[in-house]
């Protein structure tokens, strides 16, 4: 399976399970969205270091999580790279450039918009107030 097919398959699986996750999780109205690119060195660095810890965290268990990570970084903000259900979030992003970007969406509205590897810690701090 090539990388693009794998990416689309994982996105489809994430969206397909969204309804089930919403009823099982404590804060279904909170989403975290990672925006990156497979050809983005800072994104690869985040994936290697912070991503595994994020997936193992208690916070991860309490949110809906989505990844927008096309093969080419320049496509990260293209509408076709986003699942249809998340396109209203894309419309809210004020500056559609720069990665890695971390969004927190609460009640269909972006409440945290952090850019860069160093901003991941700010994202986690922001997230805590929506999970309490």
Where would I find each of the regions flagged by the language model?
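Short pre-active-site segment immediately N-terminal to redox-active cysteine/selenocysteine motifs
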Residues: 36-39
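Thiol-based oxidoreductase modules, predominantly thioredoxin-like and allied folds used
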Residues: 59-83
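A short, hydrophobic beta-strand/beta-hairpin element that forms part of a small beta-sheet core
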Residues: 99-112
